Amino acid sequence: MSDPQIPPFRRAKRLAHQKVSEILAIGARAAELQRQGHPVIVLGAGEPDFPTPPHVIEAAHRAALAGQTTYTPLAGTPELKAAIVEKFRRENGLDYAPNEVIATAGAKQVIFNAFMASLDAGDEVIIPTPYWTTYSAMVDICGGIPVTVTCGEDSGFKITPAQLQAAITPQTRWLMLNSPSNPTGAA
């Protein structure tokens, strides 16, 4: 029963034209078919196909027993940021300061946060296609304009210098590069 004093939930106007993520819709349909007993190979959103390694479980258990159960700093703990800095130095030959590192719960969240913090209405984001289904929606929700550039098999699904140059305008604010690419695997 609804309370007449409480208005019904209403989506924000900026979300009115946003559709359900295609990948989530495909995953839901695949799960429905599996429940009906149909054999389905799910090529939707990826989930690990291996159990959490024992040393990770043990480290999480030790941390919980040590009382590390409260919120951490939004950009990551100093220890985590130091480990990330060291990883980039050791494996990639890149030098960053800890204040240049932000650790989040997922790639899409940090991308959305960056767009929300930096895009104004009309700013453009170049997105090579094919691309992960939510990139253009994130740009749109944050007030930007997704500018897609088709990257076909002939270029190894990579944006070419000529394509990039043609896509850049005075309104360009970002170039979205995902390596290796999801869904093509191009690096």
Descriptions of predicted regions:
Residues 29, 114, 163-167:
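CheY-like receiver
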